[in-house]
Amino acid sequence: MATLLRVSSLCRANRASAFKSLLIRPVPCLTQDHHMVQTSQIHTSPNHHAGSKAASMHWTSERALSVALLGLLPAAYLYPGAAMDYSLAAALTLHGHWGLGQVVTDYVHGDAKIKMANTSLFALSALTFAGLCYFNYHDVGICKAVSMLWSL
């Protein structure tokens, strides 16, 4: 049992003779330095939106629209009409805008590129909504067009 030595015997003056044995590994002395306290500093990025509920409300709105679309699509098939066509145009455009906005947020980097991508996204969403409204007003509408495609 040569490996079982008391720590106090290692801290004494005959420390060198105890370390000559191959079975014994050196053990540091257990002296306590209270004046030397090591602290770690954690640097975090500043939280700019800590008090804002805008992100939470946006997420809730996205989920509410997704759930509303689950009911709106079958209702549009069962009860087609102008109000349903324009509701679908608004809901689908907003759903697509929010979804593509997340793609832009995740994959576009650099201030100028982000501004250009967001401007393009707003233009695309506005053009999509205008095109769907034009189709609803001057043609058969979204509900009737989908039912005509399904009847082929």
Curated annotation (Swiss-Prot):
Annotated compartments: Mitochondrion inner membrane
Residue positions binding heme b: 95
Membrane topology, Mitochondrial matrix segments: 22-56, 105-113
Positions annotated to bind a ubiquinone: 107
An example Gene Ontology molecular-function term: metal ion binding
Membrane topology designation: Multi-pass membrane protein
Membrane-crossing residue ranges in chain numbering: 57-78, 84-104, 114-135
Keywords annotated in UniProt: Electron transport, Heme, Iron, Membrane, Metal-binding, Mitochondrion, Mitochondrion inner membrane, Transit peptide, Transmembrane, Transmembrane helix, Transport, Tricarboxylic acid cycle
Cysteine pairings via disulfide bonds: none
GO biological process: tricarboxylic acid cycle
Pathway entry: Carbohydrate metabolism; tricarboxylic acid cycle
Transit peptide start-stop: 1-21
Pfam (any one): CybS
Residue intervals annotated with topology Mitochondrial intermembrane: 79-83, 136-152
Matching InterPro entries: CybS, SQR/QFR_C/D
GO annotation, cellular component aspect: mitochondrial inner membrane; respiratory chain complex II (succinate dehydrogenase)
Family: Belongs to the CybS family.
Role, per record: Membrane-anchoring subunit of succinate dehydrogenase (SDH) that is involved in complex II of the mitochondrial electron transport chain and is responsible for transferring electrons from succinate to ubiquinone (coenzyme Q). SDH also oxidizes malate to the non-canonical enol form of oxaloacetate, enol-oxaloacetate. Enol-oxaloacetate, which is a potent inhibitor of the succinate dehydrogenase activity, is further isomerized into keto-oxaloacetate.
Assembly, per entry: Component of complex II composed of four subunits: the flavoprotein (FP) SDHA, iron-sulfur protein (IP) SDHB, and a cytochrome b560 composed of SDHC and SDHD.
This protein's name: Succinate dehydrogenase [ubiquinone] cytochrome b small subunit, mitochondrial
